[in-house]
Amino acid sequence: MTDETVSLDAALAGDEAALEELLARVQDDVFNLALRMLGTVPDAEDATQEVLIKAITRLSSFRRESSFSTWVYRIALNHLATYRKGLFARFPVSFDIYSEDIVSSRERDVPDLSGSVDRDLLARELKLSCMNGMLQCLDAEGRSAFVLGTMFKLDSRVAADALGITPEAYRKRLSRARARMAEFLSTYCSAAGSDACRCERRIDYAIATKRIDPVRLDWQSLKRVEEAPDGERIGEPASESSAHAGDVETRTDAMERLDDAAGLFASLPRYRCPDGAASFIKDLIASGDFKQAVGDRPERSARPWTCKEH
């Protein structure tokens, strides 16, 4: 019997500590998935709470046909694909909108708005904001495939299971999304070799258009996932060779662009679930009102977490 099975059985029997342990194993992944799917820190934090609540209230419906984390991914992806409260749901973006904004050169007319904040710090904030915003230019299907394959590096079978599609369909979605992202990056982004757009040049324009706030650096305030024992950061490529496998000299230009795009996004930091979201869930589990809402029963009754999935 695995530790996961033991924790699941205990959680279903009403053990709050076991339920907290289960959620602690997946909450960072849920938050990072929400970040990439929604594009802003506040929206990701709110959505993470909602996804974890769904996982709690649907726990009794988990058939254990996949790992607990894959099951939670499925809940998260379904929730995030239809999330309508976020910034980018209200103000959609596209690669055409991004490119028009870049070629307009509007940043040239904006004065220095950085104040006393270090401009290198602001440039890093803008890069993170821009790249996560860029993901929103992909449709929900392409974005989910791109995030799972490029950033989470899930096996195609696991990713397909989480998305509820075949591995073949998943690979096609991933390939299309990677090609579209690579095309845009190679044309416009300095990180991919183009001089059309550089974060350093667009800091003041980003402040003026409220892309970043110099007094509230959301991305810089997040805590990164700890490093693995060998010194590599968990969730990032172990080395240049593993991130870009294959003989560089024999690859086509198209494949190089795909690998460059994948490498840029794969190297983005992975973050801890914010304390506010984690504490909210912990307090909710311990709440008498919440237990009653999800079907808590008298002490001798088993399986209190039995709210049916709708």
List PLM regions with ranges.
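Intrinsic, short, N-terminal disordered tails of RNA polymerase sigma-factor systems
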Residues: M1-D9, E21, F88-S144, L154-P167, ...
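A short, charge-rich alpha-helical start-of-domain segment used by transcription regulators
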Residues: D9-F31
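Sigma70-family region 2
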Residues: L12-A13, M37-T40, E50-S67, G86-A89
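Amphipathic, Lys/Arg- and hydrophobic-enriched alpha-helical face
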Residues: L23-V41, R58, R84, M131, ...
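C-terminal flanking helix
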Residues: Q27, F31, L52, L80, ...
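Structural recognition of an alpha-helix C-terminal capping motif at a helix-to-coil junction
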Residues: N32, D46-I53, T57, S66-N78
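Helix-turn-helix DNA-binding helix
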Residues: A44, A55, Y170, L174-A177
